[in-house]
UniProtKB/Swiss-Prot annotation:
Residue positions binding Fe cation: 53, 57, 124
Protein name: S-ribosylhomocysteine lyase
Organism: Phocaeicola vulgatus (strain ATCC 8482 / DSM 1447 / JCM 5826 / CCUG 4940 / NBRC 14291 / NCTC 11154) (Bacteroides vulgatus)
Lineage: Bacteria, Pseudomonadati, Bacteroidota, Bacteroidia, Bacteroidales
Family named by the database record: Belongs to the LuxS family.
E.C. code: 4.4.1.21
Length: 161
């Protein structure tokens, strides 16, 4: 079998950041998949499942209600490796295009108070698996350490050596 593109990224050198993972043509429109990498793979602990699940609920809710970008949002969801999230958006976009949006999103999560949207038995398949305090902590860490100090190394995948 062919190696899928995401397995060809050098995870040893990959930093936290926002990366274009792929672009696909769907029904005549480009869909851009972003790698929202919150943890350096294999070099720092992965996100806790409860924190990542809560980030998923809060970020998806925020993005789908965003006054400018909501009509471009296709999907937000966690990576199986627990090092970040995938964001699928309509349009032929670059990482730089969504830095401000990601700053707003992670600021929203970091500052969130109250009941997590969709975290009830009738709304969620694993409603007990939430950790708002850690979601806020991880989001603030990512915002202040990465999103507020973006460089090309946080926007473009490492090149092959």
């Amino acid at each position: 079998m062919k190696t899928i593109p995401s397995f060809t990224i050098d995870h040893i050198r990959l930093l936290r950041g926002i990366y274009v993972s792929r672009k696909d043509e769907v029904g005549g429109e480009t869909v851009t998949t972003f790698d929202i990498r919150m943890k350096e793979p294999n070099r720092e602990p992965a996100l806790g499942q409860g924190a990542l699940h809560t980030i998923e609920h809060l970020a998806a809710t925020y993005l789908r209600n965003h006054p400018i970008w909501s009509d471009k949002i296709v999907y937000w969801g966690p990576m199986g490796c627990l090092t970040g999230n995938y964001l699928l958006m309509k349009g032929d976009l670059k990482s730089e295009d969504i830095v401000e949006l990601m700053q707003e999103t992670f600021r929203f999560v970091a500052d969130f108070e109250g009941e997590v949207p969709g975290a009830a038995p009738k709304d969620c398949g694993n409603y007990l698996l939430h950790d708002l305090p850690m979601a806020k902590w991880e989001s603030a860490k990512y915002l202040h350490e990465v999103l507020e100090h973006m460089t090309k190394d946080n926007l473009y995948y490492p090149t092959k050596e």
